[in-house]
């Protein structure tokens, strides 16, 4: 690990990408200005995940009926562009895309 810093996941995906970009710049400048001293990551602490599939963006009837509002809010806001947007398949088979979400 060459640079690590905590950040908030508040806001929409574009806000989070903006913070990641700023942290990436900050980390790059820090590494260029100082000798690089890395810290070996513990394999047990590593997190692995597969590439997302479009089917993972579906909001099911079960989720709508059983999940709290903050779960649905977070799922939709994390699946805004450029990711495959959250969607719901209606009884008639039509797909309803969620392009964004706001809490009022």
Which ranges hold each PLM region?
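Active-site-proximal loop/hinge segments within enzyme catalytic domains
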Residues: 1-104
């Amino acid at each position: 690990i060459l640079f690590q810093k905590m950040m908030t996941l508040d806001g929409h995906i574009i806000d989070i990408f903006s913070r990641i970009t700023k942290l990436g710049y900050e980390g790059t400048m820090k590494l260029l200005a100082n000798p690089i001293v890395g810290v070996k990551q513990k394999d047990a602490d590593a997190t692995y995940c597969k590439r997302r599939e479009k089917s993972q963006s579906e909001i099911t009837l079960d989720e709508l009926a059983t999940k709290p509002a903050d779960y649905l809010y977070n799922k939709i806001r994390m699946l805004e562009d450029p990711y495959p947007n959250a969607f719901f398949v209606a009884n008639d088979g039509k797909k309803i895309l969620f392009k964004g979400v706001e809490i009022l």
